[in-house]
Amino acid sequence: MEKLLERVNHILEALPYITKYSGKTVVIKYGGAAMAKADLKESFAKDIVLLKYVGIHPVIVHGGGPEINRLLDSLKIPTEFIHGHRVTDTQTMEVVEMVLTGKVNKQIVSMINSQGGKAVGISGKDGNLAKAVKAPIEIELEGKEKQLFDVGLVGRIESINPEILHNLQKEGFIPVISPVAESVEGDSLNINADTFAGEIAGALEAEKLILLTDTEGILIDGKLATGLSRGKMKEYIRKGEISGGMIPKVECCLAAIDQGVNRTHIIDGRVSHSILIEIFTNQGIGSLIES
């Protein structure tokens, strides 16, 4: 009986959050270990379906780097790197789009639908969802100032037209978006999935943006930091306390906040049901950044 009461208490703990977020949009960037391990994939799909059943509108933007690497290797397509960043030429971009939109996207859709959801897979090209421009990347070389490097068909979002997402949500569907967009010249461009998720969240005026990562969250002096303001994050970056791959994730969160997203979260996707823990428990998980 005690165990049953404990389960009931867990459900009751979620009630105020269900009330608060019902009818709201939550954008989730799906990537890392959560996409690789079978048990985590299943828990992710169940989390998404449960969100929909309690009236929350999840929108998913996904990555897929490891799958791209595997197919490029199997096809023996040579890859050029500039300071660790892949150069995406036309042949590589064909593989990127095929893997992200044709394979990974449909696997996620199938996974969610198998748990009782109604997911629909699209890319940034569908319904003119996203327009992008080819953009160089900024790299800070040791002992030198930041420099710009051309890495091929890699883009930056110029505009989002969320009409297709609104229509899908209105009909009860869960949008699953691959991070490929089209330039005004008609070229397919690979977009950073974190950045794309942030832009989608801003355009939808989402209540939350959640980034699933392979870390606990933002670590400052080895300790998990949360309840962080925009100003504090800028200070941490300036002082070098946030560095490497975490910087673009934080900048993505800050950009989303600037566009009106209320709360952004960087959470540990290696933890089963981390999305539900974040949204429906008092303690939450990972790092919260808010305006």
Swiss-Prot record:
InterPro entries for the chain? AceGlu_kinase-like_sf, AcgluKinase_fam, ArgB, Asp/Glu/Uridylate_kinase, NAGK-C
User: What keywords tag this UniProt record?
Assistant: Amino-acid biosynthesis, Arginine biosynthesis, ATP-binding, Cytoplasm, Kinase, Nucleotide-binding, Transferase
Cellular component (GO) terms are: cytoplasm
EC assignment: the record states 2.7.2.8
- Please state where this protein is localized: Cytoplasm
Annotated GO biological process: arginine biosynthetic process via ornithine; L-arginine biosynthetic process
A Pfam family that this protein carries is: AA_kinase
Name residues in a coiled coil: none
Q: Which domain of life is it from?
A: Bacteria
- Keyword Mitochondrion in the entry? The reply is no
- Judged by the first EC level, this protein's enzyme class is transferase
User: So what does this thing catalyse?
Assistant: N-acetyl-L-glutamate + ATP = N-acetyl-L-glutamyl 5-phosphate + ADP
| Family stated for the protein in its record | Belongs to the acetylglutamate kinase family. ArgB subfamily.
The GO molecular function terms of this record are: acetylglutamate kinase activity; ATP binding
Q: What is the lineage of its organism?
A: Bacteria, Pseudomonadati, Spirochaetota, Spirochaetia, Leptospirales
What does the function comment of this entry state?
Catalyzes the ATP-dependent phosphorylation of N-acetyl-L-glutamate.
State the encoding gene.
argB
Q: Site positions for Transition state stabilizer, renumbered to this chain? A: 29, 249
The residues that the entry says bind substrate are: 64-65, 86, 190
Asked whether the keyword Cytoplasm is assigned, the reply is yes
Q: Pathway of this protein?
A: Amino-acid biosynthesis; L-arginine biosynthesis; N(2)-acetyl-L-ornithine from L-glutamate: step 2/4
Protein name from the UniProt record: Acetylglutamate kinase
